Amino acid sequence: MSIIVRMKGGLGNQLFQWAFARSISSRLKTSYLIDWAPFSPEFKVHKYSLDHFAIKVPLATNTDMFGFVWIGRHYKFFNTFYRLMRFRRVLMPFYYIERTFVFDPVAFSKTGTTYFDGFWQTEKYFKNIADEIRSELTLVEPLSHYSKKIEEEIQSTPNAVSLHVRRTDLVHNPVMTAFHGYCSPEFYAAAIKRVVKDMPSPHFFIFSDDYEWVVGHFKSLPYPYTCIKNGANKNYEDLYLMSRCCRHIISNSSFGWWGAWLNPKKDKVVIAPSKWFVTTKNDTKDLLPEGWIKI
């Protein structure tokens, strides 16, 4: 028996899928493989990014994918067909597609070789090995000179707050805007007000895929702040730097989610948007860990 987990999306999504694979293989006491198929449409936009971390990610070969390769080549058709099929879990037990964002314990009950397709965006899938996940996600390469300076600044700041803003694809892609939406200036104003409560002398470290926008938007912030300009090519360093802060404001982004989650401190404060998508069809009650504050 082995499991294969489909990889898709950006770094935050990839981390969820790897953590899910890592956890389910541990629970089922079996091996796992990651399907990072280059024909996957997601990778025309996003790159495979887990190789920046010192983790062993067993990638599926063509031989491993022999019985599933047709799923990838006809992914959209098969995905639609599977969703419409009655008794699909009985007729096709080797294929498991995530139906909602809500934790589904059925995933842990598979008994044969299974191909898993989903985002798995809830800590509940890997909370049992949370400490292991955090300890394993260390960077392969030393920080760049720029990021090292930022880390030193964070470490010298008793009350460092990471603030994440995701804009580029959510604002400029009409499909993403309609489905996902993005956090408003009012959200950030309310989140800042809440996160500094009982916190003397906060210093904000602002991370974003739109550096120019955050520089302009937060110029009147009444607290010391630093806008980080690593860019997409160093987003894994941003993730590490975010985790070094003691409090966090995240956007409706899996990347921001991981930046806050990787902070192992039990007393950390995390402020997150209560609405993750524009559509109300997606149940996200399990997306945010217990204790995170919704605004």
Outline where the language-model segments fall.
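Donor-binding and catalytic core of enzymes assembling or modifying cell-surface/extracellular glycoconjugates
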Residues: 11, 193-272, 277-280
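A short beta-strand-loop structural module common to alpha/beta enzyme folds
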Residues: 30-41
